[in-house]
Curated annotation (Swiss-Prot):
Its cofactor is Zn(2+). It comes from Bacillus subtilis (strain 168). Belongs to the PTPS family. QueD subfamily. Its EC number is 4.1.2.50. It holds the Pfam family PTPS. Disulfide bonds: none annotated. The active site is at 37 (proton acceptor), 78 (charge relay system), 129 (charge relay system). It catalyses: 7,8-dihydroneopterin 3'-triphosphate + H2O = 6-carboxy-5,6,7,8-tetrahydropterin + triphosphate + acetaldehyde + 2 H(+). One of its GO terms (molecular function) is metal ion binding. The active site is at the interface between 2 subunits. The proton acceptor Cys is on one subunit, and the charge relay system is on the other subunit. This is 6-carboxy-5,6,7,8-tetrahydropterin synthase.
Length: 146
């Protein structure tokens, strides 16, 4: 069971849900400057997705927890992240760093949420790579990244 305290995103919505999961995945950063991380290695990532909104769907959900798990865990668990199209380009916004993994998860979750009638929004994605290292992605309102 996960029992974490995460940095909180400020938002104006009435409802907020958080979905925790673990993902076991390998990756490498194909840059000399990445040091040891330039070699294939793995992590058991801890991922927390925060979704918020004002309206519930017909089932009384903001979004079904199982769909969030399928979108993330179902896509990345027990894989080499570099093999995914999301991380296959050789540019800084496609390398499977913790920062890019968090933003990519956000992009995928928000794309799904945009299809829902009740229009919830992903306000934060937290990705912990090690016990001492994590990244939080929060989209900027009206910016290119959110």
């Amino acid at each position: 069971m996960l029992s974490q305290i995460y940095p909180q995103a400020q938002h104006p919505y009435s409802f907020e849900l958080n979905k925790d999961m673990h993902i076991s995945a390998a990756h490498f950063i194909p840059r000399e400057s990445a040091g040891a991380c330039s070699r294939v290695h793995g992590h058991t990532y801890t991922v927390n997705i925060t979704v918020a909104g004002d309206e519930l769907d017909d089932s009384g959900f903001l979004v079904n927890f199982s769909v969030l798990k399928k979108l993330v865990h179902g896509n990345y668990d027990h894989t080499l992240l570099n093999d995914h199209e999301d991380f296959s380009q050789d540019d800084r916004y496609s390398l499977p760093t913790t920062e890019v993994v968090a933003k990519t998860i956000y992009d995928n979750v928000q794309a799904y949420l945009d299809t829902l009638e009740n229009k919830p929004t992903c306000v934060q994605v937290f990705v912990r790579e090690t016990p001492t290292s994590y990244c939080v992605y929060r989209p900027k309102k009206g910016g290119l990244n959110g």
